Amino acid sequence: MEKIFNHIDQHIEETIETLFKMVSQPSVSAQNYGFDKAPNLIKNILSDYGLNSQLLDTPNNGNPSIFGELKSNSNKTLMFYTHYDVQPPDPLELWESDPFKPEKRGNKLYGRGMSDDKGNIAARLAAIKAFLDIENKLPTNLKFFIEGEEEIGSRNLLGLIETYKPILKADACIWEGGGVNMSGSPLIYIGLKGGLTIKMSVNKLSVDAHSSYSPILPSSIDRLTKAMNSMKNDLGQIIIEGFHDAIIDLNKEQREAINSLPDDTKEWEDKFGVKLLGNDLESIDDLNMKLYSEPTANVNSIQSGYNGPGMKSVVPAYAECKMDFRLVPNQNPAEIYEYIKKHLIKKGFSDIEIEPLHQIFPFRTDMNSDLLDIVKTSAFEIYNKKPLVTPNMAGSGPMYEFGGLLKMPICSAGVDHPTHNMHAPNENITIDDLSLGAKHIALIMKRFSEI
């Protein structure tokens, strides 16, 4: 592998050039900005790197996905999942450079999508090019799936996979993301929480009323907050009947993996300005277990009454909120939605209207997977530090569509670092992270072909 690794280092400027080309083309899915050009740009880049590439039509006129494939003499097929859509760059005034005019400053590369997720695309292409240039072939059959709607919840991915299922089959998948923590230890996750987002609303009056009528008129915002509060007890535990019934307890290996995760409380406390340990979270093990293995119920937003400048004394006629529920493996978002509806009726909130906005299933790969063993051992060789494995991330994503529907184990491996400012101004990636990520991918490809 020494020749492959040397090639990655020797051609790093070419990799950066490819990355800059992708970052220069906006692809902001939340604003539907840049998709007249971005899909074909990515498709053509894959073709330039030797892959047979095509655009995959997305249901409901969604942003196209890009599919690339390259066969080898192997009987194994590895899938790469990434996405080319990015977050909005706002607030623009906090950027030190134009988010879509990438810049190199020292060892860092700046621009929207530099790390999430175009950096991962570039790193994987660098690994592919190294094998093709040095060995004239890949060690394993390869499929490259690049989504265009990940940042807006992959809302059309399920339908796309049902349509293109025959060409998307593979033996295993390397997920987008992954990378290292602050101390440089590789982070590998093998699962993602699912999710359900709902909108709840109530209209108690025909029009807003003067607040002097508040002693005799019902307040929609008061009614809505009571409905939301009914879903948790004073300890913040979810008390919706049936909500936890399907959850399967973590096994010994999964618990040990979570308990081996580092103590990041100080970093989080400094970042968010709160004290995390105390009350029901007595230790870092309690915190990590809650963060990575428990479902959640969270209020995203509340809209009601007057929120403009100055003051306006009213009894709000209408109120609405949006909530998201992060779900753990074996929870079904459709079933959870029904439990929420029944809960509201049972607690006397039949006047609250509820609407599902988005759902995604949870997924987790087995801790004894051959793929995980390959990703771990290769990570240790590249980064020279013991990798940390998380049975699933705290967040959600479309992993079930590949792992559950297409029946393949999934592990993450990537170029991420906590200082990359993903989803924030001045998103960046270091050249070292880009190079190490490419080498890790290359070694995974080689080892995967040998099992």
State where each predicted segment sits.
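Flexible glycine/proline-rich, aromatic-decorated loop/lid segments
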Residues: 187-203, 411-415
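An extended, acidic, His-containing surface patch that forms the Zn2+-binding/catalytic region
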Residues: 182-183, 239-318, 326-339, 347, ...
